[in-house]
Amino acid sequence: MFEINPVKNRIQDLTERSDVLRGYLDYDAKKERLEEVNAELEQPDVWNEPERAQALGKERSSLEAIVDTLDQMSQGLEDVAGLLELAVEAEDEETFNEAVAELDGLEEKLAQLEFRRMFSGEYDSADCYLDIQAGSGGTEAQDWASMLMRMYLRWAEARGFKTEIIEESEGEVAGIKSVTIKIIGDYAYGWLRTETGVHRLVRKSPFDSGGRRHTSFSSAFVYPEVDDDIDIEINPADLRIDVYRASGAGGQHVNRTESAVRITHIPTGLVTQCQNDRSQHKNKDQAMKQMKAKLYELEMQKKNAEKQAMEDNKSDIGWGSQIRSYVLDDSRIKDLRTGVETRNTQAVLDGSLDQFIEASLKAGL
C-alpha cells in the first residue's frame, strides 16, 4: 500500500503557499488589469500607436505569467486531490504515481513564482543592457571577454530572452575588446543585475606557446533600459558626440558612411556607442537611450552603498571588485560573494548560470 498522508500534506502545503502568493502578488488586481489590457489589445486601432501596443503586449505577458500560473495551481491542486481519491478507492498505484508526478510539476511552477518575489526593485522587470569589457592582458583578456559574451548569450537564449548586439569592438588577434548587448525579456534586469563586477579567468593560455598558466580579467556591467520619461537631465554641453564608420572583423567596413555614433558624458566619463543600424540618426537615438540608462543606474548606485560607483571602477579591472573566479585547470568556478561553487566548468561557460544568479539574489546582493 502507498503512503497517502505525505501527499495530502504536500497538497495542503502548496495550497497555503499559493494563497500567500495570491495576496503578496495582488492576484485580484492583476486579473482585473489583465482583462483591461486584453480589451485594449482587441481594439482595431491599437496598432496606430505601435510603441503603446508593444508596451501593452509586454504588460500582458507579465500579468499572464502570474495570473495563469496561480489559476493553474488552483485547478491543478483540485485535480491532484481527485486523482489521489481515485487511487485510494481503486488501490491503483499507477494513478497514485501520476498524482505525485503532477504534484511535483505544480511545486516547481510555484517555486518559480515564489522566486519572483526577489524582483522587488523598481526596474527589475525591465529589459537591460550588458557591457563586457576586456581587462589589461591583451589577447588572453580579449578572448576571455568573448567567452563571457558567449556565456551570457547562451544563458539568455535558454531563458527565452531575445538579444541584440548594440556595439562590438573586435580584439586585435582574437576575442573582443568590448561589447554592449541588449537583453529583452521578462525581468531581464532583475535576473542579471547581480552579475555586475569583475570575472577572473585562470587557465593555460592557448596563445602561449609555452602553455603557461595565465590570469585574465574582464568586467560585466548591467543596467536597466529606462523609460523615456525618466527624470534624468542631460546638459547637451556635457556631451561629446563622435561619428565614425562602422567596421567589422579585420577592419572591413560594414558601410562607407559615418553612421556609427559614440557619445561621451564628459563629467562622468561614461561612454555609449551604437553601430548596428545604417542610419546615423537611429544609432544616435539608441546611444542616447543607453546614456540615459547608464546615468540612471549610476545615480541609483550613489544612493545605494552596496552598489557604490561600480561604473567608476570599470577602468580598474583587477582584484578589487571580483565577483567570480573561473579556474579551468582545476575545473572549478566559484562565486566569491556567495561561496557557490561548481566543477562543471563547461556547463557554466555554455550558459548554465542560474545556480550563481539565484544564490546572489537570495543573499540580497
UniProtKB/Swiss-Prot annotation:
GO terms for cellular component: cytoplasm. GO terms for molecular function: translation release factor activity, codon specific. InterPro entries: PCRF (IPR005139), Pep_chain_release_fac_I (IPR000352), Pep_chain_release_fac_I_sf (IPR045853), PrfB (IPR004374). SMART domains: PCRF (SM00937). Methylated by PrmC. Methylation increases the termination efficiency of RF2. It comes from the Bacteria. It is found in: Cytoplasm. The modification N5-methylglutamine is found at Q252. It holds the Pfam family RF-1. Its main location: cytoplasm. Keywords: Cytoplasm, Methylation, Protein biosynthesis. Belongs to the prokaryotic/mitochondrial release factor family. PANTHER family: CLASS I PEPTIDE CHAIN RELEASE FACTOR (PTHR43116:SF3), PEPTIDE CHAIN RELEASE FACTOR 2 (PTHR43116). Peptide chain release factor 2 directs the termination of translation in response to the peptide chain termination codons UGA and UAA. This is Peptide chain release factor 2. The gene is prfB.
